[in-house]
Amino acid sequence: MKQGIHPDYHLVVFEDSATGYKFISGSTATSKETVEWEDGNEYPLVRVEVTSDSHPFYTGKQKFTQADGAVDKFNKKYGFK
């Protein structure tokens, strides 16, 4: 691997802004904020808006909407059932 061209890969704590859930993962993301993790070490803190803890797909609160298709629109427009 060529030296000096790859981003710095390190452990980072991600915090879900909506729920406050925190998890640690390897990343190239950086931040000036730091937080002390459960192991006693200090890691950069990256705040994110959506994680698996708050996304509707993962929480089971996903809602599906019924979109009218072209045939339904035609039938509605011309009064067919």
From Swiss-Prot:
Say which domain of life the source belongs to: Bacteria
User: Gene Ontology terms, cellular component aspect?
Assistant: ribonucleoprotein complex; ribosome
Q: Which UniProt keywords apply?
A: Ribonucleoprotein, Ribosomal protein
Q: Name one GO molecular function term.
A: structural constituent of ribosome
Q: Which GO terms describe its biological process?
A: translation
List, alphabetically, the Pfam families matched: Ribosomal_L31 (PF01197)
Q: Which InterPro entries match?
A: Ribosomal_bL28/bL31-like_sf, Ribosomal_bL31, Ribosomal_bL31_B, Ribosomal_bL31_sf
NCBIfam families for this protein? L31, PRK01678.1
- Family from the record: Belongs to the bacterial ribosomal protein bL31 family. Type B subfamily.
Subunit notes for this chain? Part of the 50S ribosomal subunit.
Its name, as the record gives it, is Large ribosomal subunit protein bL31B
* Lineage of origin: Bacteria, Bacillati, Bacillota, Bacilli, Lactobacillales
Q: Which gene encodes it?
A: rpmE2
